[in-house]
């Protein structure tokens, strides 16, 4: 009986804090509970997912790196279970703590413009915007871009009376559209966001979203200043090194050799993991190689080939060497370098696959179809079906598989005929 008053008090408080009522007390209670219970757990799960994605990510340095790691197909599912937990927690927070009912105000009280704007809101729990945004980000990082775009689109309508929240959602909506190659929709979302003044808290989000879009569209000139800003703003060493490597790749694509070299040097200054540092040094030799420096760059690569630290990367070393020779129109030496990479490379991944494709292309141009067929057949087992031009490569390989028995027979007959006449 002594506990009855306490239980009655708790019952009264809980009744007063129903989401069907909109009072200062109910808003405080549901904001506090959402933040420090379900949302907190979801936020921690999201952080763990991001750590798993960053530590487990494996970039393909033979291609232009995606701005965001979610762009790597093989890394897309890293941290997926953590992001799913974050989504579930956010959904629970929204379900339990959303306050849609408008507050009751005195009919005689004069309503200021601020009060009128407040009453235009569709969600009155002041903290739930964080749960909505976290849910959308978790869907994006999980790779469910359609769901993410849908969530962010809903946020722009739900928080139309709060421009900062709506614009943050538009920026993430643009990222989601970019990830699906829906560039028109991404540009439209960005355009809508830019109609309002972007606060300083969202400037970097805007910068990175635009950089990702320009890179995905192949607009490298426009992407350069945004990449520079992103790399400079990044404080963590590994992501910073990765962005400088990407900047080096972009400058190389644009023919800006000195700028590419400087960006790669900044990448190396971050003391990145060995594989990233190795690829940065490889790319440095390629961007600096010209008629005057080609021999020096080849010598540098030969020293790298002799280093025991690089024994697992010999396919890349000789691939870079072959590329330098090809740039000097020395096809014979290029073939020699590529063949060495083919023989000495111990891996069976995309790096060796790219080397084999380059070698196969040369043999194809020289009408040496037997060698081309072997290179294409071997390369197909090392590249993914998502590789650019995979369908054409597979078709050419199939043609050669059918053609080579006949060309081999013709060559044999020619050899026998030659022997019979000597």
PLM regions: where:
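Sec-dependent N-terminal signal peptides
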Residues: 4-13
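Acidic, polar-rich low-complexity tracts and alpha-helical solenoid repeat scaffolds
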Residues: 16-422
